[in-house]
């Protein structure tokens, strides 16, 4: 698993086909989500992740990057190869002057 900065994520979103997954709780997502992300709460990851393509590029994020790092390790243990964690989560994303969108 590779840890990436908000700037690196912004570049990946513009250039590559990646799967961006917000693993925060429902009440946290009400504040906004990174455009292009899907919301899969961490509590559902163990059920959802095994059905996904392990060869795709996956970026996980949460509030500050702790929960998403745990999800990245789960993905790695399932054989996923291209896993990224947004260091600092949405806090770092917003502090870097990137926006969240409302669902």
Where are the regions a protein language model picked out?
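Short, surface-exposed ligand- or partner-binding patches at beta-edge/loop junctions that are enriched
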Residues: 61-62
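Rhodanese-like catalytic fold shared by cysteine-dependent sulfurtransferases
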Residues: 1-19, 23-57, 66-103
């Amino acid at each position: 698993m590779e840890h990436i900065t908000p700037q690196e994520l912004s570049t990946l979103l513009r250039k590559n086909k990646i799967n961006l997954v917000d693993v925060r709780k429902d009440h946290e997502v009400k504040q906004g989500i990174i455009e292009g992300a899907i919301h899969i709460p961490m509590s559902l990851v163990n059920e959802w992740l095994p059905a996904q393509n392990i060869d795709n590029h996956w970026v996980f994020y949460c509030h500050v990057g702790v929960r998403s790092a745990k999800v990245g390790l789960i993905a790695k243990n399932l054989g996923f190869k291209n896993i990224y964690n947004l260091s600092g989560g949405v806090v770092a994303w917003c502090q870097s002057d990137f926006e969240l969108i409302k669902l």
